[in-house]
Amino acid sequence: MVEFSHTKKIGSAGRFGARYGRKVRVRVRDVEIKQKKAYKCPVCGFMKLKRISTSIWECKKCGAKMAGGAYTPETGAGKVVAKAIRRVIESKTKEI
């Protein structure tokens, strides 16, 4: 009999079988889906940004490398900071 490394509902976390509990396996599945997904490159704009290793992302089209989050190129905190910086820059340009 052939063993499957994944299942329909749990995806790649099916490799753990019945171990570790359902919630943990679902969480692992969600993280792995996020990290394996192709993201939009901030330099060239193509959907070719892939994870090389922890927090290192590379565009397969233009070759640009960047540091980002461990599982996604931009973290939630990074988005908040970028938005705050954008607001400060916009307010300074309005004053001038």
Curated annotation (Swiss-Prot):
Q: Name one GO cellular component term.
A: ribosome
Matching PANTHER family: 60S RIBOSOMAL PROTEIN L37A (PTHR48129), LARGE RIBOSOMAL SUBUNIT PROTEIN EL43 (PTHR48129:SF1)
Query: GO MF terms on file?
Result: large ribosomal subunit rRNA binding; structural constituent of ribosome; zinc ion binding
Which UniProt keywords are given for this protein, alphabetically ordered?
Metal-binding, Ribonucleoprotein, Ribosomal protein, RNA-binding, Zinc, Zinc-finger
Mark the C4-type zinc finger spans by residue number: 41-62
**Biological processes per GO annotation:** translation
> What does the entry comment about cofactor binding?
Binds 1 zinc ion per subunit.
Concerning Gene3D superfamilies, the annotation shows:
2.20.25.30
Question: InterPro entries of this UniProt entry?
Answer: Ribosomal_eL37/eL43, Ribosomal_eL43, Ribosomal_protein_eL43, Ribosomal_zn-bd
Keyword check for Oxidoreductase, yes or no: no
Answer whether the UniProt record assigns the keyword NAD to this protein. no
Which Cys pairs does UniProt list as disulfide-bonded?
Answer: none
The similarity comment for this entry is: Belongs to the eukaryotic ribosomal protein eL43 family.
**Where does the record locate the signal sequence feature?**
none
Q: Which protein is depicted?
A: Large ribosomal subunit protein eL43
What are the names of the required cofactors? Zn(2+)
In terms of domain of life, where is this protein from? Answer: Archaea
Originating species: Methanococcus aeolicus (strain ATCC BAA-1280 / DSM 17508 / OCM 812 / Nankai-3)
Q: Which gene encodes it?
A: rpl37ae
